[in-house]
Amino acid sequence: MAKNFKLPVQIIDFIRTHHGTTVAYFFFKKYTDLNPWDTTKENEFTYPGPKPFSKETAVVMMADAVEAASRSLLKYSEESISELVERIVYLQEQDGQFSDIPLTFKDISDIKSSFKKRLSNIYHVRIAYPERDY
């Protein structure tokens, strides 16, 4: 569809790689809960890829996953946001999604710090201001 609309190749790259070869875990978990005897279908719930192949496509993958997961937080605090970002990026790293990219530990640390700051700004809790009498 992106090619039909003549989107730039860089945008198409982001579209193709933003899920990499990850498992659509929510749907896979639902399936295995309903079919506990069938553990052979994980590949049917796995995105075809490719994995991110540039720092930029890796950042988009991380941002997409972190933003989506942040919507399911029950409580927004610095701690819950930090734990979420750490967990999501750790799982992507462990899954080998960044194996084709020269990301350094510093790169990943800087990216996670940026996400934590941005999400904290988005979800910050304001104090309730008292009503003014006019």
Regions found by a protein language model. Name each.
Residues 1-134:
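Terminal helices and disordered tails flanking the catalytic cores of nucleotide-processing hydrolases
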